[in-house]
Amino acid sequence: MSEIATMAQGEAGAIGPGRLVLVVGPSGAGKDTLLQLAQAACIDDHDVVFPRRVVTRESSAAEDNIAMSPDEFRRGIDHGDFAVHWDAHGHSYALPLEINDDIRAGRAVVVNVSRTVIAALRQAYANVVVVAITAPPDVLAQRLAARARHSDGNIAERLSRSVEDASAQADVTILNAGSADYHSRQLVRVIRNESWRE
């Protein structure tokens, strides 16, 4: 599996002053659920942006991505439509180039990414905050089995996957094993650069 981030060309220096909030974590941790709740909580905050990822997989109720075919995705790369793109789990993922304008305007941009692209994003953006959302292994396994998404592949393999990269260390970790509302409030506090514990 190849998970190498490729950044848009032509950017000089780290992009800022806004914050890039990277939400990472294992499959089944509840990242999409917490992101949806956080987005709803920030709906009237124009300084917080939740861009839709571009993915070569159909969108679903749990993951509101922009679906593209592999050919369309390749054309997007060729046209410079993405701020960053990577491949993981048999799919291609990208963040739209417009996030750079939001960050230059001082907004917080909140995105779900692979842990393997954190190092490249920390270099490209001036103010990066990594939020790891996780859950106990038995909870992860239950959630993956319950969603029964074909593209999840081998559940045991997904659960055993790790990233050995110091730059992938989280700045904040949320153990999402209780109330999704409670944990989404923690995430909102991080997004707004407030204390994240209650």
UniProtKB/Swiss-Prot annotation:
Kindly state one GO CC term assigned in the UniProt record: cytosol
Set out the biological process GO terms recorded for this chain's protein: 5-phosphoribose 1-diphosphate biosynthetic process; organic phosphonate metabolic process
Keyword ATP-binding included in the entry's annotation: yes
Give the Enzyme Commission number: 2.7.4.23
* Highest taxon in the source lineage: Bacteria
Q: Which reaction does it catalyse?
A: alpha-D-ribose 1,5-bisphosphate + ATP = 5-phospho-alpha-D-ribose 1-diphosphate + ADP
Which keywords does this chain's UniProt record carry?
ATP-binding, Nucleotide-binding, Transferase
- Which PANTHER family does this entry report, sorted A to Z? GUANYLATE KINASE-RELATED, RIBOSE 1,5-BISPHOSPHATE PHOSPHOKINASE PHNN
* Family the entry assigns: Belongs to the ribose 1,5-bisphosphokinase family.
Q: What is this protein called?
A: Ribose 1,5-bisphosphate phosphokinase PhnN
